[in-house]
């Protein structure tokens, strides 16, 4: 995908009304993907043309690099983060009346299972998959920052008069559905996350990393996704493979709330791979805020008119696609509406969070006694600093000084 197309999509996002998302995707007609590449606008709710103000009318065609694209408008509901209050009780929709097994305590640990943290008691999301920390070679668990981090914004967006939160100490628990969480459910500790920026700055990743205790995993089982049929190690898809995903109907996921979504009846389909949208529900010093994201994957049920490709509590789950006969992780799910899910691209997650795919071999494990905390004066938007040869990640705001 050319930079001109990406730039035009962001230009359209900023020039359209609040709440409109934009992507280059697959046109939908009568509830089916047509295969026609088009500029897709997503809206919370469609309205008759007669009810739209002049500013709300979207273009019927868009020209980019001499190519004219027809446009499509797709109703999504409100796009929001999908961790959920842990007391929410909920064919393809059996999860609405029979809680899926993803919510149980799963040992050995696998991807797709219920997760929470000490700093976010009262909420629950999904442990997406196990990966390798590129810096240490240690086995780690991957989820969203809004699943385990109380306030993931860069400190530069915070005020001394607001709530000051940090991740100096934060245990991770599986299952996340039994709260208050007991020590017997602890699987590790939160290590780091990709900090968020407030609008108009764009984000690409809602991601966090937790350590994994050797006692809760297995070399032969923990690379699997709970309930999915695949039994082989899943590599990360490459950038070119993700760019070619639009229309892929061999897409699946397993999450805490909706359970397994796989196969010709209950599977998923990729709608676009460069989605630009605002996402509500991020906590900034106790206030729910909107963050802007670009270069995201949007996905639907195989029938795009069917609801809930993702649901509150599924945040952090892996998005898996079959590419060349091989199941690969293509994204990290983090948001959605009633008819669309949104995932961070795994190539960007890997780069910004500093991870590699786990190949299933016996791994190293994080030595939690080696965790180090330092402080720097003032607020800033620096993700990492180097201290005594170590790379340290921003993890919030604290009163006090422990200078590097």
Regions found by a protein language model. Give the residues of each.
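Structural recognition of the beta-strand scaffold that forms the well-ordered cores
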Residues: 40-42, 141, 318, 331
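Short, solvent-exposed loop/turn segments that connect beta-strands within catalytic domains
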Residues: 29-35, 133-138, 323-328
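C-terminal subregion of chymotrypsin/trypsin-like serine protease catalytic domains
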Residues: 298-302, 309-310, 320-387, 391-392, ...
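Ser/Thr- (and often Asn-) enriched beta-sheet segments in non-cytosolic proteins
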Residues: 63, 68-70, 80, 94-96, ...
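Noncatalytic regulatory segments and standalone regulatory/sensor domains
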Residues: 1-130
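Surface-exposed flexible segments
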Residues: 49-65, 222-234, 342-352
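Serine endopeptidase catalytic core focused on the charge-relay Asp
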Residues: 96-304, 312, 321-323, 334
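Short, solvent-exposed mixed-charge patches
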Residues: 1, 403-404
């Amino acid at each position: 995908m050319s930079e001109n197309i990406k730039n035009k999509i962001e230009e359209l996002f900023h020039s359209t009304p609040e709440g409109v998302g934009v992507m280059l995707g697959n046109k939908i007609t009568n509830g089916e993907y047509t295969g026609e590449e088009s500029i897709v606008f997503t809206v919370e709710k469609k309205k008759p043309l007669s009810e739209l103000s002049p500013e709300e009318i979207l273009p019927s065609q868009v020209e980019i690099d001499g190519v004219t694209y027809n446009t499509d408008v797709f109703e999504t509901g409100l796009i929001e983060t999908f961790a959920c209050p842990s007391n929410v009780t909920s064919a393809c929709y059996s999860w609405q009346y029979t809680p899926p097994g993803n919510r149980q305590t799963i040992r050995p640990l696998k991807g797709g299972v219920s997760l929470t943290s000490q700093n976010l008691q009262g909420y629950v999301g999904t442990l997406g998959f196990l990966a390798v920390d590129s810096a240490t070679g240690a086995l780690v668990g991957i989820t969203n920052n809004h699943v385990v981090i109380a306030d993931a914004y860069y400190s530069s967006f915070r005020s001394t008069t607001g709530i000051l939160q940090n991740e100096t100490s934060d245990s991770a628990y599986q299952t996340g559905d039994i709260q208050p969480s007991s020590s017997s459910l602890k699987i590790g500790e939160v290590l780091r996350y990709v900090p968020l920026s407030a609008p108009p700055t764009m984000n690409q990743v809602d991601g966090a990393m937790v350590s994994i205790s050797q006692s809760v995993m297995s070399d032969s089982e923990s690379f699997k996704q709970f309930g999915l049929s695949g039994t082989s190690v899943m590599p990360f898809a490459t950038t070119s493979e993700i760019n070619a995903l639009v229309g892929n109907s061999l897409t699946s996921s397993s999450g805490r709330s909706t359970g397994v979504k796989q196969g010709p009846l209950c599977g998923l389909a990729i709608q676009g791979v460069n989605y630009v949208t605002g996402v509500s529900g991020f906590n900034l010093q106790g206030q729910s805020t909107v963050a802007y994201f670009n270069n995201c994957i949007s996905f639907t049920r195989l029938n795009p008119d069917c609801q809930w490709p993702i649901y509150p509590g599924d945040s952090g789950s892996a998005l898996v696609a079959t590419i060349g006969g091989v199941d690969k992780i293509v994204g990290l799910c983090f948001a959605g509406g009633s008819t669309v899910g949104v995932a961070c691209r795994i190539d960007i997650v890997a780069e910004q969070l500093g991870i590699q795919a786990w190949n299933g071999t016996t791994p190293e494990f994080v030595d939690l006694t080696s965790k180090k905390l330092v402080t720097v004066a003032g607020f800033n938007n620096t993700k990492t600093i180097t201290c005594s040869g170590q790379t340290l990640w921003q993890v919030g705001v604290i009163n006090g000084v422990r200078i590097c």
